Amino acid sequence: MRMALGVSYNGQAYNGWQSQPSGNTVQDRLEAALGRFATQEVHTICAGRTDAGVHGLMQVVHFDTQLQRAPFSWVRGTNTFLPTDIAVQWAQPVPDAFHSRACAVARRYAYVLLQSPVRPSVDAGRVGWVFHALDEQAMHRAVQHLLGEHDFTSFRASACQAKSPVKTLHRIDITRRAPPAGESTGTHGCIPCYWRFEFEGNAFLHHMIRNIMGCIVAIGQGLYPPEWMRTVLEARSRDAAAPTFSPDGLYFQGPVYGAEWGLPTRTAAYDWLP
């Protein structure tokens, strides 16, 4: 029997998703918990790997098992053995043809950024941070150059193992959540607010979103014009782009599957993001 799980996690304490000899990864913790519940070794395959410090709202994994249990028994039983910063949100039996990675038609990420003269405190590690005001129109114009199919070599980490740097970005949305009028505590021309950058594409390269974010923020701060984004893209060189941005505010929102699989499309964790 093949099972699919939706998993959410705070990535601050882990060395990314993928299993490592240290054992301090989300995959290692999940498989250990599944093994204890199932009393047998369980190997999972995920929809998309995340780096150290990156969070997951709805990672999807699949695995094969001989254990017959109700779907919610998998949820409660596995969560019993998981640390508090990792939780299985749902479980569902799927056909043997389902593959969490190969069946995904797209993947979604969000980056949450705090704009404030004061560094984050209660949300430290869960948001990125800038202390300069950002130009929304400039950032919006800049990301238009990235939509569609392109060679994203300029935004690719040197350790990336992808066979091709050509990917397709379907959507990049930028939204700003500001405090109510009259309640701003901004200083030095920087009004505190949260920015949310949402990305949807067929697939992503290693560090691709964090490298794009570095360029978006540089343009938002006025260091470069919006057209610089196209210059960086066409250079096809990592040296042409801005430094890699912090992993703190990056969230893997999850994969997108066809309706024929009947899998959940979101979890409650989506609703608390700014």
UniProtKB/Swiss-Prot annotation:
Read off the InterPro entries from this record: PsdUridine_synth_cat_dom_sf (IPR020103), PsdUridine_synth_TruA (IPR001406), PsdUridine_synth_TruA_a/b_dom (IPR020097), PsdUridine_synth_TruA_C (IPR020095), TruA/RsuA/RluB/E/F_N (IPR020094)
Query: What protein family does this chain belong to?
Result: Belongs to the tRNA pseudouridine synthase TruA family.
The catalytic activity, as recorded, is:
uridine(38/39/40) in tRNA = pseudouridine(38/39/40) in tRNA
Q: Which UniProt keywords apply?
A: Isomerase, tRNA processing
Q: Which GO terms describe its molecular function?
A: RNA binding; tRNA pseudouridine(38-40) synthase activity
Which EC class heads this enzyme's classification? isomerase
| EC number(s) reported in the record | 5.4.99.12
Name of the protein in question: tRNA pseudouridine synthase A
Sequence positions that bind substrate: Y109
Active site location:
D51 (nucleophile)
A Gene Ontology biological process term: tRNA pseudouridine synthesis
Subunit info here reads: Homodimer.
Q: Which CDD domains match?
A: PseudoU_synth_EcTruA (cd02570)
